[in-house]
């Protein structure tokens, strides 16, 4: 299955481009996709994960719907899914 993963803000800087396209097996989860992409881009894992869990400060959507309204990081991907990963903006 073909999926696209779009990165924004500092995540895009680490990845070096806006979109990463992947071929994944059926039943692949959002969490597994992000883990494999992070494996290919040094520094991305520290931005995405804390204690092997997706950081709460990350907004992850699948086809425009936040994954928390689906099955969280365990949401299974389907062909031509668009995953968007955006860090929360924090400041004072």
Please report, for each region that a protein language model flagged, where it lies by residue.
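Ubiquitin-like/PB1-type beta-grasp interaction modules and other compact soluble beta-rich domains
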Residues: 1-91
